[in-house]
Amino acid sequence: MAGHSKWANIKHRKAAQDAQRGKIFTKLIRELVTAAKLGGGDVNANPRLRTAVDKALSSNMTRDTINRAIERGVGGGDDTNMETKIYEGYGPGGTAVMVECLSDNANRTISQVRPSFTKCGGNLGTEGSVGYLFSKKGLILITSGDEDVIMEAAIEAGADDVQVQEDGSFEVYTAWEELGAVRDGIESAGIKIDNAEVTMIPSTTVELDAETAPKLLKLIDMLEDCDDVQNVYHNGEISDEIAAML
């Protein structure tokens, strides 16, 4: 799990900026619709939908908008015919990049994703080319709290690992299938959770210098600007000193 915290803050800061500009709303609605279509409209019985709802609420989406998206998904129709597709490739500095897309037109999606890699000095790879470097995990972020209390609650709830960050925050890792159960267990202990999501954690990382780091972030920006792209994962490691300059 090395390297995750080095770029997690940049990712989350960017997500907040995107939400302020309204860029992320279309993607959130698309995920809500798809999650409801595949698993039903009950958040208590549909972990993917609950995660999508939590993410939408944290981005200040209204309950009315969320409920309408869920109703669209449950009701079906042509506009809900979305499929998840993962593209793999190499970014600046030899970084491994995985792009999670949700689309009803694979040709349109690849025509957006491939040029982003090319323009940033990377290249789109074949299926499996970098996927083996990542593990699908549940990740729970807790900004602050008593370390002993959080550790005990997380372990009791079934977490795989808890890491204390330099800023005093906590990253709780779970099997991705157990994310909802672990989240519920931690919350039942009275602990405030700031974010919970299924993500891809790199097993090895590539340290980026001051010249390469901005190029990787540019690639991420270009990919996230694509309407069909939901998430971008990478194994680039950016030091605190370089991150402070970005």
UniProtKB/Swiss-Prot annotation:
InterPro entries: Integrase-like_N (IPR017856), TACO1_YebC-like_2nd/3rd_dom (IPR048300), TACO1_YebC_N (IPR049083), Transcrip_reg_TACO1-like (IPR002876), Transcrip_reg_TACO1-like_dom3 (IPR026564), YebC-like (IPR029072). It is found in: Cytoplasm. One of its GO terms (biological process) is regulation of DNA-templated transcription. SUPFAM superfamilies: YebC-like. GO terms for cellular component: cytosol. One of its GO terms (molecular function) is DNA binding. Keywords: Cytoplasm, DNA-binding, Transcription, Transcription regulation. Belongs to the TACO1 family. PANTHER family: TRANSCRIPTIONAL REGULATORY PROTEIN YEBC-RELATED, TRANSLATIONAL ACTIVATOR OF CYTOCHROME C OXIDASE 1. This is Probable transcriptional regulatory protein PM0980. It comes from Pasteurella multocida (strain Pm70).
